[in-house]
Amino acid sequence: MTLKVDVKTPAGKTDGSVELPAELFDVEPNIALMHQVVTAQLAAKRQGTHSTKTRGEVSGGGKKPYRQKGTGRARQGSTRAPQFTGGGTVHGPKPRDYSQRTPKKMIAAALRGALSDRARNDRIHAVTELVEGQTPSTKSAKTFLGTLTENKKVLVVIGRTDEVGAKSVRNLPGVHVISPDQLNTYDVLNADDVVFSVEALNAYISANSKEGASV
């Protein structure tokens, strides 16, 4: 089964329709798989530069603070022991790599599941362009997106060369703009609606489907 989505223009008119291949937009979402891929994606974003010093790495504390016996106090060997102010940290974080290895087929399958979920709920839109003309206009882009969906979180997918479109939406709150080769499971699931330019949709379908796109 091939889904069809009307192609909208900034003027509010319908300029034909685009077919969404079932192999990309009509598969059964695997919740566990999408969770695994999103977790790995977020983990890869972590810097992992956190670092604490152990008692052996903290400066100072080389001299025994007081004699072993006869003071009535607990014996201490260094003022850099964890129980002292300014002492080392016990089992504190050290620099590490949080990235997880995720097979490409799993990443692609999770993305297909996420897009299929949005497509089934009529939350995938296709547009000819975001604004008319060659001058960026945030106001016009905001108005146009408002005619497509009332939801606040929108993922906009446009071609890398569409600077006018990118500049028009990049400052809109709740709107995230990416190119088709950057399309990923997290961004799709994090957005309420996904808006493709016809160019970007064709590029994504052509790269991931044997049939390609047809408008």
UniProtKB/Swiss-Prot annotation:
- The segment annotated Disordered runs over 43-100
Q: Which domain of life is it from?
A: Bacteria
Q: Does the keyword DNA damage apply?
A: no
Signal sequence range:
none
**Which controlled-vocabulary keywords does the entry list?**
Ribonucleoprotein, Ribosomal protein, RNA-binding, rRNA-binding
Q: Which Pfam families match?
A: Ribosomal_L4
GO cellular component annotations of the record: ribonucleoprotein complex; ribosome
Where does the chain cross the membrane? none
Q: Which NCBIfam families match?
A: rplD_bact
Query: What does the annotation say about its assembly with partners?
Result: Part of the 50S ribosomal subunit.
**Name of the protein:** Large ribosomal subunit protein uL4
> Which species is the source of this protein?
Mycolicibacterium smegmatis (strain ATCC 700084 / mc(2)155)
The gene for this chain is rplD
